[in-house]
Amino acid sequence: MTPRRILSLLALALCASALVGCGGDALALDPVAKAATTTAKTQASRFDFHASMTAGTAGSFSFHGNGIFDGKNKSGWMNMHFSLPAQAQMQLGTTDPSMEMIFDGHHGLIMYMRSPLFDRVVPTGKWVKMDVAKLAKKQGMDLGALMNANQADPSQSLRMLMASSGARVTGAERIRGVETTHYAFNIDFKKLAHDNRAFRQLTDKTGSISAPAEAWVDKQGRVRRLSVTMTMGAALGTPMTMSITEDLYDFGERTPIAPPPESLVVDFDSLSGSSS
């Protein structure tokens, strides 16, 4: 597996966590769907997350991080650290598997990534620019239609909770000192795909139809924590299972975020080994 192939896999893993921000109307009687709608209206928040992923022969890895998103300005920033399989880390040639990311959602979703993981394929300090919709199109998915202009807002990722099914209360817990009600439920991807051709195309490609999930909702009806496990990609030849837990806090807090200057950017498509 080449360094570029590993880079592609990491990027797709990150994209997978963003794919959930699409389509569907909230079900008024479903408490989780209602909380997702309320949270999506906050526009900005800080977040922490941790995730693990198993991807076919590539093995298992995990990542965690934090960031802030500004939905009004359609931008976001994220810092994360990866725990990679030994072979992958050796091929990438670094002991610092961390990454800084900037999201620009003004036109689809553009991701800028800077990391020591890329030192073998890009000059040190440069940002890799990736057009997510363009990458997805190479995989036969119309991600440009799938993702909306507000994808850089993390509350948009909560929109998949609008397709919750069978939500039930499992208890009451404090999340970062805030009292919440804990719900367990399933996400029905067919509900998301019903009025969204692009998402229906995605589910057909990945073979994913549902996912178990949990949500912690505060007294203001906002999602403070969500946890989802997704299995996908078998139909594409690379079966993947990803579990991610995300905390949302500091709602309404905004921070100016701008893309890096063009002089520091390398386009993903220009990297060598594109056929690997």
Mark where each language-model region is.
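Subset-of-secretome marker
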Residues: 22-276
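Secretory targeting and sorting signals
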Residues: 1-26
